[in-house]
Design a protein with these regions (language model features):
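Short, conserved loop/turn and helix-capping segments at secondary-structure boundaries
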Residues: 49, 139-143
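Conserved alpha-helical substructure of the radical SAM core
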Residues: 1-121
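Structural beta-sheet core signal
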Residues: 99, 124, 162-164
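Residue-level signal for pocket-adjacent positions within structured domains
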Residues: 45, 101, 131-132, 161
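Short, basic, helix/turn surface patches
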Residues: 121-132, 150-159
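Conserved strand-turn element in the central/C-terminal portion of the radical SAM core barrel
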Residues: 149-173
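A general structural detector for well-ordered alpha-helical segments in enzyme core domains, enriched
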Residues: 54-58, 86, 110, 142-152, ...
Length: 174
């Protein structure tokens, strides 16, 4: 496994020869388990997940185009029933993977799958203190679940960027 300095060199070399996008955001599913008022994602009962085969064809195309990084997101990435197979498939294609999540479905077992396939970083949405976060996401208890997911990631060696959307509800609490 390369050190941070070596990894920086790998990235610089890749950028010198790049003929395609360096990074691609790939929406794995439009489905989400939360109901944030500002978000375009839909609740679980309204939409369907794309097939695993469809996602694999997209990953194949990105690999052929020599895309370096795929950022996996949704909706909520972890609502996708085959999220672990997607991670494994993309890893086997040599893709560098990150993810975006609301954190509520992340467990230490899921983090173990992520790290087994080289996922070292991701992003989790935290929209302020507990009361504001729960109000924004439309689900009481979502803050506590997101924090447990964040802690599972950090405990398992996955670095996390915290994403915050500023709204009227949290603007004075950030």
């Amino acid at each position: 496994e390369p050190s941070s300095l070596e990894f920086g060199g790998i990235v610089k070399n890749k950028l010198r020869t790049i003929r395609s996008p360096f990074s691609v955001n790939l929406e794995i599913t439009p489905v989400c388990n939360l109901r944030c008022g500002f978000c375009f994602a839909e609740s679980e009962c309204q939409l369907h997940h794309p097939s695993f085969g469809h996602i694999c064809r997209i990953i194949d195309e990105l690999a052929r185009a020599e895309v370096f990084e795929i950022r996996l997101f949704g909706g909520e990435f972890f609502t996708y029933p085959h999220w672990d197979r997607v991670i494994e498939y993309a890893d086997n294609k040599g893709m560098f993977l990150t993810f975006v999540s609301n954190g509520t479905l992340i467990t230490s077992e899921k983090v173990a799958v992520l790290t087994r396939h080289g996922v070292k970083s991701g992003a989790i949405s935290i929209h302020g203190p507990e009361d504001a976060h729960d109000a924004i996401t439309g689900m009481k208890g979502s803050y506590q679940k997101a924090m447990r997911g964040l802690e599972a990631c950090l405990g398992g060696g996955v670095y996390i960027t915290v994403l915050t959307t500023i709204t009227q509800t949290n603007k004075n609490k950030i």
